[in-house]
Amino acid sequence: MEKIKLVVAGVEITFEPNQAAYNKLINEMSMDNKVAPANNYLNRIVAADSKEALAGIITRPGAALQLVGKINEIYAPELEIEVKN
């Protein structure tokens, strides 16, 4: 399992993203529902020893979406796709 360690506001938090959690995030998100799925995703993938640290950070406005963005930038980077005719 891939581990991603981030230092957020001076606090180290470890995440363990996986395909099932990532897919669930994508399926739960909608145009008017982004924050709750982001919070759920982070709580699904945070390492047990980082749960308390995440709880302290996630209450900040915008924190959940910023964390999800950074984690998924590493976990699921954009593919280079070229169209050939």
PLM feature spans:
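Short, surface-exposed, charged amphipathic helix/loop patches that serve as local interaction elements
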Residues: E2, E16-N85
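Short, solvent-exposed loop/turn motifs
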Residues: E12-T14
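Short acidic, Pro/Gly- and aromatic-enriched capping/linker segments at domain boundaries
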Residues: M1-A9
